[in-house]
Amino acid sequence: PSELDRALKYETGYAGRSWFLKDMQDNQLGNQIASSIVTAYSDPTMEGYGSFSYDHEGTPARRAYILRDGVLEEFLNNRQTAAIMGVEPNGSARSTEAQLVPLIRMTNTIFAPGQQDPQSIIADVEDGYYIAGHRTPSIAESRENFRITAVKVYEIKKGQLGRLYRDGGITSDSRDYFMSIDAVGN
């Protein structure tokens, strides 16, 4: 939901909207929308697939912090939507073909590493599940709810991986999910 064309409802029929911005006065910019240990960014300057130096409007590529310490910091934007919000464009306009209008899209989207070793996170779980190998994501039009199916789901009991299940998943309210994160692996 961090693409500003979606948030401004430019492509609701095509790709949905965003709960980050209901309208210009009712938006989540600057608000805590995730746990303070969550930082996420889109970075087209990283080497590899999804990398570029300039977007398809000629804007220099740069890292765009979507969430920093759980606070919604910026939307991915293009020149038009950046002007509407009164901010600088962040190089997120891309097109699959030269004759098509560039759309605002994520590049290399990263959740920044946390402080904890993944094994210590599992060891701290009394009763839960470890979900591995996502398969099919599904998200509501407003991006408020989501479902992700997984290849493997391990039961966790008293800090130990246990029974293996196939084809499980998770369904959640996006806001509740992001606010309830209490550990991020390194």
Ranges and model annotations:
Residues 1-186:
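N-terminal small-residue-enriched
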